[in-house]
Every structure is written in structure tokens, then in C-alpha cells.
Amino acid sequence: MEEKDNDSLNLIDSSSKKSQQDSINNSQIKTKKKQKDLILEENDEEKDDEEDEKINDIENEINENEKLKDLMADMNEEEEEEEDENENLNYDRHFDRELKVGKDYEYKTIQAAINDAKPNNIIKISPGIYRENVVIKGKTKIDICSLDNNDQAVLLSDNSPCMMIYCLEQSDTIQIYNIKFIHRGIREDIMKKSLFEIKFFSRYMTHNKESYFIYQFAEEIEKLEINYVLDIKIVENIFEENHGNFCAISILKGTVSINNCKISLACITTETKSILPAIYVENSTAIVENTLIKGNKDYLTIGIYSHDAQLKINECKIFRHKCGGIISVVNEKNSITVQKCRLVLNQGCGLLIMSIVGKSALKEKAKGTKDTLEINIEKNNIEFNEGCGMNLKKCFNAKIIGNIFLSNLLNGAELTDCDGFVMMNVFEKNKGNGLVLEAIEESNEAKIFKNKFDENYKNGIDISGDNNKCFINQNDQISGNYLNGIYVHNLATPEIKFNNIYENYHHGILVESKSSALIEKNKIYENIRTNIAFGGLLTGKTRILENEIYNSRNEGIYIVDAEGGEIGNNKIYNNNDGMVLIRCKDIFLYCNEFYKNMRTAILLSDSSTATLLKNEICENYFIGILVRDGSQGRFKDNLIRQNVIQFYLSKNCLNQKNYVKKLNDVQGRYEVADYCCVF
């Protein structure tokens, strides 16, 4: 018994280790098909890269029509399924004029057609490769597309954007569809001349416990180990001096729709030492749909970067970017929607959205106005990113619904100083935590409903920070995580209700020192170390109410070094020990049912004190209540029967013997045993 009582929360027996290893092996087998599919997909992408390189090889031979025709035919093989969905694009608008671009048409360059275009005109570009830096300034209601839906025109550029758009009004519209954009990078001398200064972009990153303060500039860029980035901090004027001068598509004012396009940064040929976005959006509205946005394995790229912009991204694939798939800096007037997209194989993060001024300031600015920040992340696959899958910082009104966060290198998703809803998502096999809810500077009041957290390498849900009052509610599966189902620490005070928490390798719920939680109406079972554990300074506000707590190979509830705590109306059964209290003070247990636990229903040890009122302690396979090591209990109106030993008091606790018999209903062969040779 001494050995048992001195066990800490960090002990686990050899059988649990074996079980953990078996589950890890099974998990690897189950993901084999997914990884195989990903490898096949990467092979297809390698072929796409080769196709992009062919464009460079024949750039100086662009007038050789035979080679050009063959090249464009090869390009059309890329992502065949996307083309099938969009080959019959039908834009029913009536246009006043149609401007055609090509060697056989009136306009030989795209820029010439743009310059001549009027509102309600459409520009159709014949198949071919156009090396231009197209500028659309002061135009509205213009459509730009390929002449042949089955043969995309290619706009090729380096040093400057393939296309830069600056309308007169935000309501002015430009539509772009069925075009391929290729950017080949930025020369260092061009970049320096742009006054793209260090101060406008900084990152603090950690790599293998070694910290760097990283500048996005030539001298320091070699230190950038983005593939293992743990944190990204963006200052207010990120990319301000750039103003979209270095990207594939730059949107600086207006409402721009990009549909059924392909944007590739895979064929960078210059020694680019800047971070290159595929799409840059500032103070504008961008709608990006059915578009493939490819990064580069060797150079620093971002899929989409937006600053103070409205962003709607739908059914896009954004992949292989070394600085993140989507990065967005928002204010109180912005709306960010990402739906039905695939964000895969990006380094640093799949998706990052943050407010610079903070959540409270955003809410204050939004008061009395119709404008309010909206973030909708719905039905996306955020998978295999070499970093965090999704990271939201200082945001409110976030709706994270129906996404899959799978096999990301760090955490599946992180919400820092946020509120909103996280509903019906899957967090599975991420190498860190499934979901991190953190309060650093402001409160976190996120509501976590009906999600699945399975086989994450750390915790299913990690909750931390002062004023973290998040709600964990109705999640049907928090299971198979290699540490804890739910981990509460660093002053957090969440509410955890109506969840199924089971088969986690450490604890179902762990509440550490200086934190507390309301744990109510959950089913918590078959967790390997304990079903619920809490203890340490300030954990005494923890309340465990109306739960079913069963089938743990160790303790149903384990409490150590806690002062206070309320455990009421729970069913605690089929555990090795129902409840263990070590060095605790003033624990209040009432109206609980303890039955069919293997060793003890309730153990008080190491000078613990507790009040037990109206509990039913029946049919446990050894001892009903064990009080030892100078512990003191106040027992009243408890029903104690049909245990092998109803009540056991160690030598230094015998003064409670008559008190227990008088105030409680103790029935059975052994009412009180003064000594026990087993412990």
C-alpha cells in the first residue's frame, strides 16, 4: 500500500507502455494508405514542376508554334479533375465588347488590351506564353480569361507581379478566370531597390530549442528554419513597403475574382531571398475559387497573404509553401472565409489569421457600426503541414466548422486570445496537440462542440492561460491521444460538459496546479493512468459533478496536494481504485455511487481531510473506505455495504471508529477492521 500511495501522476506500468506502442503501430498501419496517396500526389506535382520548367526552356523559342502547342497540351494534363469540373464554365453576362489577344488578333499583348478596355468588356487571351507585367489601373467591370477553356493562356513574370490591380473604388470589379500565372522570383538587386526593409517583417522562431530572431532580408534569410516553426509574429506594417510589388498577383484596391486559375511559384530561377506570396491582397476584396496555388520546395513562398482585406477562398488547393499556405492580418471590418480548400504540405503553418490590435480593441471599434470581424473556416482539409495546421490569434467571431486537421507536424489548430465556435471538426494524428486554446493577453472564450480528437501525439485539447474560460461541450470522441484527453494548466478555468473521454494513454482529464475546471455530465472511461486527476495550488475550485467515471486500470479520480474541491452525484465504478486522495484538505464528496472498484472505493492517505456525505459505497471487491497515515474524515449518512471490508482505519486513525459506525449505515460481514495485512 505504501508503494501505491507514493505513486505520482507520471507513473505507468509496463502493460500500458506495451498497449501504447501497439496503438502507435496500429495508427501507423491505418495511415499507410493516406500516406501512399499523398506520395502519389507529390509525384504528380513533381511532373507539374517539370512542366513549369519546360516553359523556361522554351521561353526564347516562343515563336516555335509546334513546341508551344505541345507544351500547352502537357500543362492541360495537370489536375485533370479540376479541369473537368470547370471546363464548361458559363458566364452568362452580356459584354459590350470582346477584345482578343494573340498573334493572330488585334491585340498582341495583354497590356494593350487592358489599356483599351472599357466597363463591361471581356478580354480573351489565346493559348500561349505571355511574358508581361500586366497593370490594371482605374478599370472596372472587366473580365479576363483564356480564349479556349481547354487550353489556358500562361502569364509569365519575374521581379514584378504577373498582374497588379488597382481600381479607383473598392466596389470596382475585375474577374479573372482560366489563366495560369507563373512567377520566377526576384533578383536581390531589385529587392533592395524597393526599400523592402527589415523592420516591416519579423519572425521569432524556434528550431530544436534554439531561438532565432529572423529578418526577411538577404543577410539573415539563411537562418530561416521555417520547416519547424513554432511561432510566427507579424508586426503591423508587414509587407507595407512591398505594397504587392513582389508576388504573382497583386490586389491593392477593388473587388477581384480569381476562378479556375493556376498560380505557380514552383519554377523560381533567380536566387530569391525575399518571401514571395502567390497572391497579395491589401485593402481590397479578393474572391479566389477553384484555383491551384503551388509553392516552391526550395524558396520562401506564401500561398495567399492579405492585410486589412476581405478574403473569400473556396475550393482551392494551396500547397508546398515554405512560409505558410494562407496568412491574413485583420481588423474589425474584415471578413475572412476559407471553405472546401486543401491546405497541405505547407511549412510554418497551413493557415494563420491574426489581429494586430487585439480582440478587445476590435470589439470596441466595431461597437455602433455594422462592420464586425467575421472568420469562417469551413470544410477544409488541413493536412500534412510541417508546422501548425491552423493558427488564430486575437480574433473574435471565429467559426471553425467541419474541417479535418490531420497529421500536421505540430498542433492541429491553435486559438490564442480568441472566441467563437469550433464545431464538427476532426483533429487526428497531429504530432503535437489536437487543439490548443491559449489565453495570453486577453480572454479565450471559445466554444468547442461536437468534434473528434483522436490519436494526437500529445493532448487532445490543451487549455492554458489566465482568464481562459473556454467551453468544451458534447465532443463525442476524445480518445487515443498519447498524453491526456484534456489538459488544463497555467491558470485556465474551463467548463467541460457532456463529452466522451476515453482510452487516452495518460489521463482522461488532467488539471494542474493553479488551474481549475468544472467537469460535469461527461463519460470518462478506460483511460490508462487515471480518468480524472487534479492537484496542486488553486485547484481546489475544481468541481466534478454528475459524471460516469469507469474502467480505468488505475484510479477513477486521483487528487494530490489539493485544498478544496467538490465531487458530487457521480457514478464511479469498475476502476482499480475509485478515488484516491493524497495530502489533500477539505475535499467534499457527496451523493456519489462507488461500486465494483477492484481495490478501494475511497482512499484517504498522507494526512488528507475530507467530508463524505450521503455516498453509496457498495459491492466493491475489497475495501469500501480506507483511511490511513493520519488522515481524517467526516463521514455522515453514507451507505457502506457488500464490500469485502466495509471500512478500514489504520492505527493512527482509530479515533474515528465509533464516529463512523454511529453516523453511517455500515452493513456487511466486516463493519470496521482495525488492521489489514494486505496494505
Identify the residue ranges that each predicted region occupies.
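PEST-like, low-complexity acidic/proline-rich intrinsically disordered segments
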Residues: M1-K18
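Acidic, Ser/Thr-interspersed intrinsically disordered low-complexity regions
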Residues: K4-S8, I39-Y91
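Acidic Gly/Asp/Thr-rich repetitive segments characteristic of extracellular carbohydrate-active
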Residues: R93-R131
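Extracellular beta-strand-rich solenoid/capping regions of secreted or surface-exposed proteins
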Residues: Q111, N115-P119, R131-C145, V154-I232, ...
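Short glycine/acidic-rich loop motifs that flank beta-strands on beta-rich extracellular proteins
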Residues: R131-V135, S157-M163, R184-K192, E210-Y212, ...
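All-beta strand scaffolds that present successive hydrophobic residues in beta-strands
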Residues: D143-C145, I174-I176, S202, I232-V235, ...
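Consensus "Asn ladder" position of solenoid repeat domains
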Residues: I179, N237, C261, T291, ...
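Short acidic, low-complexity intrinsically disordered linear motifs used
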Residues: C676-F679
